[in-house]
Curated annotation (Swiss-Prot):
The gene is NP. Homomultimerizes to form the nucleocapsid. May bind host exportin-1/XPO1. Binds to viral genomic RNA. Protein-RNA contacts are mediated by a combination of electrostatic interactions between positively charged residues and the phosphate backbone and planar interactions between aromatic side chains and bases. A motif (Unconventional nuclear localization signal) lies at residues 1-18. Encapsidates the negative strand viral RNA, protecting it from nucleases. The encapsidated genomic RNA is termed the ribonucleoprotein (RNP) and serves as template for transcription and replication. The RNP needs to be localized in the host nucleus to start an infectious cycle, but is too large to diffuse through the nuclear pore complex. NP comprises at least 2 nuclear localization signals that are responsible for the active RNP import into the nucleus through cellular importin alpha/beta pathway. A motif (Bipartite nuclear localization signal) lies at residues 198-216. InterPro entries: Flu_NP. Residues 1-21 are annotated as: Disordered. Late in virus-infected cells, may be cleaved from a 56-kDa protein to a 53-kDa protein by a cellular caspase. This cleavage might be a marker for the onset of apoptosis in infected cells or have a specific function in virus host interaction. The lineage of its organism: Viruses, Riboviria, Orthornavirae, Negarnaviricota, Polyploviricotina. This is Nucleoprotein. Keywords: Capsid protein, Helical capsid protein, Host nucleus, Host-virus interaction, Ribonucleoprotein, RNA-binding, Viral nucleoprotein, Viral penetration into host nucleus, Virion, Virus entry into host cell.
Length: 498
């Protein structure tokens, strides 16, 4: 990518920093995660959680959600201006699970947001530490990506549910900043833009007045983020057209859907980061690990190392398979929901199965679920190898793929052929090549049709032994190419509903 030099690294976005060298980046990311860890330890003390209860992923998620809610200024303002029955705008809380007389019991807790903000700042040297908050948002987003399929959301915006491999980060809040934008998939950006254009079509005043000016700036910014994800000139030129449109409407929606489809073959650059639950950082800090001194990276060996010796528990419903629950959380930790299952399986060292074959529901427990029969189990989050997380979509290779998900978005920088069926994708491109973007559309279709297998395999580094922290001896795995690689293949995963 020609523009590489102007880009800040993901870690810089993550820590809100300007240009830094590798050591400074490692230190500032280390500072960020140790702040999360210190906060978690303090919250466990406040709530008087036992060691076991503090390692429960459901408790971790509740505590993470509380701090995110405490710092959600827009929602806090909204709640204060629109007081709703039974919601105290100044308080936040959620379910905390405790072990009592050999059973798990749910206790609903409430805290002042001000108090939570104080504890968070205190754990982060008095700063707001927005980067740490974004980090938690990305972990929740990665968990959603692994747990739910966004079929309904895709259909609502007029996109094809088979494009789910482009939907990384679709549940990230708008306020997640540059680090959040980096991990959003092409489909996610397209969906946000289509929603915006549809509002403009239905509401005459959407683009008008002082508010409309702000809306327009947001629209152009989102267009630029999406443009930056594309790697070919024609795709970027089409994004310029969409961005410069005087009055965005159906033509722009068509263009965006076309671009999303094209991204199944001409993949966008989407960042992947291993964001772990707060309790994992808490455990490490409590054991005396100094993240800031040692440095930390979200895209290297560090998260694998951390998970190698962290014991995290999860509540398990009566008919769920603990191994499947572990797979779900492992995928979320490494942001691997859209990775080729063969690559994930090789790295993890145990077979990673498609979503439809998992006997497990989401990690969070609804408030109306009966706690009587709940059990808890250790999550198996260790891996056999580690690999560098990628920020590019790579190029693609004509392989057979399935009716479920017709492409993957590589997470790990590992050399492989990419599974998808060219015929399936090209079938989506019949019809409309007229209009002001016709030459670009023709060019994009030509590139997709002429892509040769070697152009479109993913050139990566390979995987590494966990003892090889400097990544000196890449192991290039060989895969059975007849095997299905998609996670949401022919699937019945639950929908994500806000």
């Amino acid at each position: 990518m020609a523009s590489q030099g102007t880009k800040r690294s993901y870690e810089q976005m993550e820590t809100g920093g300007e240009r830094q060298n590798a050591t400074e980046i490692r230190a500032s990311v280390g500072r960020m995660v140790s702040g999360i860890g210190r906060f978690y330890i303090q919250m466990c003390t406040e709530l008087k959680l036992s060691d076991y209860e503090g390692r429960l992923i459901q408790n971790s998620i509740t505590i993470e959600r509380m701090v995110l809610s405490a710092f959600d200024e827009r929602r806090n303002r909204y709640l204060e201006e629109h007081p709703s029955a039974g919601k105290d705008p100044k308080k936040t809380g959620g379910p905390i699970y405790r072990r009592r007389d050999g059973k798990w019991v749910r206790e609903l807790i409430l805290y002042d947001k001000e108090e939570i903000r104080r504890i968070w700042r205190q754990a982060n040297n008095g700063e707001d530490a927005t980067a740490g908050l974004t980090h938690l948002m990305i972990w929740h987003s990665n968990l959603n990506d692994a747990t739910y399929q966004r079929t309904r959301a895709l259909v609502r915006t007029g996109m094809d549910p088979r494009m789910c491999s482009l939907m990384q980060g679709s549940t990230l809040p708008r306020r997640s900043g540059a680090a959040g934008a980096a991990v959003k998939g092409v489909g996610t950006m397209v969906m946000e833009l289509i929603r915006m254009i549809k509002r403009g079509i239905n509401d005459r005043n959407f683009w008008r007045g002082e508010n409309g000016r702000r809306t327009r700036i947001a629209y152009e910014r989102m267009c630029n983020i999406l443009k930056g994800k594309f790697q070919t000139a024609a795709q970027r030129a089409m994004m310029d057209q969409v961005r410069e449109s005087r009055n965005p409407g159906n033509a722009e929606i068509e263009d965006l859907i076309f671009l999303a489809r094209s991204a199944l073959i001409l993949r966008g650059s989407v960042a992947h980061k291993s964001c772990l639950p707060a309790c994992v950082y808490g455990l490490a800090v409590a054991s005396g690990y100094d993240f800031e001194r040692e440095g930390y990276s979200l895209v290297g060996i560090d998260p694998f190392r951390l998970l190698q010796n962290s014991q995290v528990f999860s509540l398990i419903r009566p008919n769920e398979n603990p191994a499947h629950k572990s797979q779900l959380v492992w995928m979320a930790c490494h942001s691997a929901a859209f990775e080729d299952l063969r690559v994930s399986s090789f790295i993890r060292g145990t077979r990673v199965v498609p979503r439809g074959q998992l006997s497990t529901r989401g990690v969070q427990i609804a408030s109306n679920e009966n706690m009587e029969a709940m059990d808890s189990n250790t999550l198996e989050l260790r891996s056999r190898y580690w690999a560098i997380r990628t920020r590019s979509g790579g190029n693609t290779n004509q392989q057979r793929a399935s009716a479920g998900q017709i492409s993957v978005q590589p997470t790990f920088s590992v050399q492989r052929n990419l599974p998808f069926e060219r015929a399936t994708i090209m079938a989506a491109f019949t019809g409309n090549t007229e209009g002001r973007t016709s030459d670009m559309r023709t060019e994009i279709i030509r590139m997709m049709e002429s892509a040769r297998p070697e152009d479109v395999s993913f050139q990566g580094r390979g995987v590494f032994e966990l003892s090889d922290e400097k990544a000196t001896n890449p192991i290039v795995p060989s895969f059975d190419m007849n095997n299905e690689g998609s996670y949401f293949f022919g699937d019945n995963a639950e929908e994500y509903d806000n």
